[in-house]
């Protein structure tokens, strides 16, 4: 806890989110913008709000987020992971419900590297019989 803020770091793909929560009225600010202005897709907004709605804290906290790297989906996942960790920092009794929903575990899937001699990570050149 930093002052009256609770902190959590979230990661997803190449995105990293630093999340600070404190008691408030439900404002979420991402990189200085309201969440609805920062994330253009409705699914991204839904992903970010999942841990708050699960724990019935949607209108309980003001949240400030700094997120870098990755694209929109990766950043939304990183923010969700950070909010989850900050909620656990605030109240450890929330951990079992968040863990059962799968929000505590970091999604370790990363982009597979491109291999030499292939078009992409696994896509080979088209085979020609003749």
Swiss-Prot record:
InterPro entries: Ribosomal_Su5_D2-typ_SF, Ribosomal_uS9, Ribosomal_uS9_bac/plastid, Ribosomal_uS9_CS, Ribsml_uS5_D2-typ_fold_subgr. Belongs to the universal ribosomal protein uS9 family. Keywords: Ribonucleoprotein, Ribosomal protein. HAMAP family: Ribosomal_uS9_B. Gene3D superfamilies: 3.30.230.10. GO terms for cellular component: cytosolic small ribosomal subunit. GO terms for molecular function: RNA binding; structural constituent of ribosome. This is Small ribosomal subunit protein uS9. SUPFAM superfamilies: Ribosomal protein S5 domain 2-like.
